Amino acid sequence: LFWIGAIVVSTMKQAKRKRSVQKDEGFWAVFTHFKTASRTMLKDRRLFWLTIANAFIFSAPMAVLEFQQVIFENIGIVAAVFGFIYAAKRGISMLFSTFIHRITRSLSATGALFIMLCLAALYFFGFGFLQNQMLIIIVSLLPSIVVVIQDVVISDFRNKLIPTGSRATTISFGNFIGGILKAVILGAITLLTLFVSIEIAHVIIGAALVISCLYLIPMT
């Protein structure tokens, strides 16, 4: 069988042209997809503002997570505890994922965003003002709940508003907006630390987030 297979393979001709989806579509196809997604969002006012508000609330705490360990060390939490904290975050995410939809079933998208904003604000102001180690650890778990609400509840609302044919492209465009916001917020907090402490920088970012979202959320 081996030799028969070898003979068959040896008689096969190499393909004359290798096709590449990336090459066929070209780099500019990315912008075409984003153009389609932006049109989809602009046609539905609720979808547009839901995507923007969600990007702000979700991206802000995700952008500053890298600074958690600095604040932990500033208040005396030793590095050996970090692993337990991050394990607790994963546990919180798993736990809330199982029943978060039951809790938020009666909520509108606006209500879910408001809960996310409250949790994000508690995180920023907690890391800005708290000095108690246990309270800081508890507050550090809040972004995990924000992630669950975003992944389960907000995604459900968005999927109901997006036409089936452009769902993947529109969601990708929303993620792209979130990525830009993360970069901007990360750059902003880095610049702030040149003038104020990392704790005060958290308070400033948190205040800016609350002010922005108190305008954005009612639009949803």
Features from the language model and the residues they span:
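Structural signature of the two symmetry-related core transmembrane helices
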Residues: 111-126
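Membrane-interface helix caps of multi-pass secondary transporters
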Residues: 70-76
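A membrane-interface helix-boundary motif in multi-pass transporters
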Residues: 1, 188-210
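Juxtamembrane intracellular "pre-TM" segments in multi-pass secondary transporters
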Residues: 14-52
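Substrate-agnostic recognition of the 12-TM MFS/MFS-like secondary transporter fold
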Residues: 1-13, 49-70, 82-105, 116, ...
